[in-house]
Curated annotation (Swiss-Prot):
Broad enzyme group: lyase
The protein, known as: Argininosuccinate lyase
Catalytic activity: 2-(N(omega)-L-arginino)succinate = fumarate + L-arginine
Any single GO BP term: L-arginine biosynthetic process
CDD domains recorded: Argininosuccinate_lyase
InterPro entries xrefs: Arg_succ_lyase_C, Argininosuccinate_lyase, Fumarase/histidase_N, Fumarate_lyase_CS, Fumarate_lyase_fam, Fumarate_lyase_N, L-Aspartase-like
Involved pathway(s): Amino-acid biosynthesis; L-arginine biosynthesis; L-arginine from L-ornithine and carbamoyl phosphate: step 3/3
Pfam families assigned: ASL_C2 (PF14698), Lyase_1 (PF00206)
Domain of life: Bacteria
Places the protein is found: Cytoplasm
Length: 469
């Protein structure tokens, strides 16, 4: 019985008196999703083998055989020729079994001084580190596309909103740079997360470390880790880094979702501020006229998906005692899907933003509605000595009158304005209308962080310089 089990390749089979149920095999196997870790698994194994040889734990001949066998396996995987076996449960045992088949006993010595517990923790960190770097690049691409569009629209005026009500005029460039700020913070979070990802668990073995004279720091250096995990129990059981990454990814998607909501609104014929290129839209199977912004709509939906993965990982870890538990097999699919979703979304959004057509006339027309320069009139009165609360009340009265007449504040004549605001008439001169123009309103906010066109250009320049950091 034992020899038959060994032929099937189960690494623990000598301990049991009956073979594993086929149902249990399918239930516990992870190879058909964790095989994406194959190349980092090979990299980790080669670093481990090199250290074992340097420490005289395995021979130089064994190391040479392992390196030769791993090169062949890597080629098979890259060419799609590797035969993954359900019986071998996961990526680690599949590769080890193939290595042993190729090089014999030297392959059996590879696992000396390590466990799959520290092996998989190392693989995930190696893989995620690379994906964080990729996502950082994609965030830069999206930020760059937004900066380009912002620079092109530093003078384009649209209404700024609070509570989805017209508030004050802003430049479209300023509005876009708000999203650049969000995605810049996302990039910072990814960099911060990477620092905690980049610690080596290998050497912790199953949970207690190993009795072999290993050199963990040498392996860390070979694999590009900043250091080692300091506690063997924590090293094999920690998934904080995966949760932290997924939380950062959820914020990326939240920012994408907020932007998506505005894109959908702006593209609506009732608003008509922008048009999204046809290649990013779909039509209707029944309504011939439709052009639907499916990409931003789907991004809103996918945000819920990533948020769900975050909750799944938090829930996965909340009841686990030290050290490693099989529960942790469930960390990979949420993590993999989060990476795929965020990367795909960022890539398509960078391309979509570059293809947006802006409609400045529609934006300007909307900014002329809703008394968007009312605050400027109040500020005008304050600068002439009126307390702000009194100015606020006077302008609110003027807005009420104009609203009833269906006109804007700028449509009043000077005499009408003085007549409607007798208590402040002595403060109002003909220059008041300079404050009521959209251009005057945005130009007056020329301070760092303000919406004035000169500040938008300066902010865009600074944001572009930050892309390389």
């Amino acid at each position: 019985m034992t020899s038959q089990l060994h032929k099937k390749g189960e690494a623990w089979s000598a301990r049991f008196s009956e073979p594993m149920s086929e149902l249990v095999k399918r239930y516990t196997s992870s190879v058909f999703f964790d095989k994406r870790l194959a190349l980092v698994d090979i990299a980790g194994s080669l670093a481990h083998a090199g250290m074992l040889a340097a420490q005289k734990i395995i021979s130089a001949d064994d190391l040479a055989a392992i390196e030769h066998g791993m090169a062949q396996i890597k080629g098979e995987i890259e060419r799609g020729e590797f035969e993954w076996q359900l019986d071998l449960e996961d990526v680690h045992l599949n590769i080890e079994a193939r290595l042993t088949a190729l090089i014999g006993d030297a392959g059996k010595r590879l696992h000396t001084g390590r466990s799959r517990n520290d092996q998989v923790a190392t693989d995930i960190r190696l893989w995620l580190r690379g994906e964080i770097d990729r996502i950082g690049g994609l965030l830069n691409d999206l930020r760059g596309a937004l900066i380009d569009l912002a620079e092109q629209n530093a003078d384009t005026i649209l209404p700024g909103f609070t509570h989805l009500q017209v508030a004050q005029p802003v430049t479209f460039g300023h509005h876009l740079l708000a999203y650049v700020e969000m995605f810049s913070r996302d990039a910072e979070r990814m960099r911060d997360c990477r620092a905690r990802v980049n610690r080596l668990p290998l050497g912790a073995a199953a949970l207690a470390g190993t009795s072999y004279p290993i050199d963990r720091h040498a392996v860390a250096k070979t694999l590009g880790f900043d250091g080692i995990c300091a506690n063997s129990l924590d090293a094999v059981s920690d998934r904080d880094f995966a949760i932290e990454f997924t939380a950062a990814a959820a914020l990326v998607m939240t920012h994408v979702s907020r932007f998506s909501e505005e894109l959908v609104l702006w593209m609506s014929p009732r608003v008509g501020f922008i048009d999204i290129a046809d290649r990013f839209c779909t039509g209707s199977s029944i309504m011939p006229q439709k052009k639907n912004p499916d990409v931003p709509e789907l991004a809103r939906g996918k945000t819920g998906r990533v948020n769900g993965h975050l909750m799944a990982l938090l829930t996965l870890m909340k009841g686990q005692p030290l050290a490693y538990n099989k529960d942790n097999q469930e960390d990979k699919e949420p993590l993999f899907d989060t990476v795929d979703t965020v990367a795909d979304t960022l890539r398509i959004f960078a391309e979509m933003v570059a293809g947006i057509t802006v409609k400045p006339d529609a934006m300007r027309a909307a900014a002329l509605q809703g008394f968007s320069t009312a605050t400027d009139l109040a500020d005008y009165l304050v600068k002439r000595g009126l307390p702000f609360r009194d100015a606020h009340e006077a302008v609110a009265h003027a807005v009420k009158i104009c609203d009833a007449r269906g006109i804007d504040l700028a449509d009043l004549t000077l005499d009408e304005m003085k007549q409607e605001l007798p208590n402040v008439a002595h403060l109002i001169g003909s220059d008041v209308f300079d404050y009521l123009t959209l251009e005057g309103s945005v130009a007056s906010r020329s301070h760092p962080g303000g919406t004035a066109p000169d500040q938008v250009r300066a902010a865009a320049k600074a944001a572009r310089a930050a892309l390389g950091k």
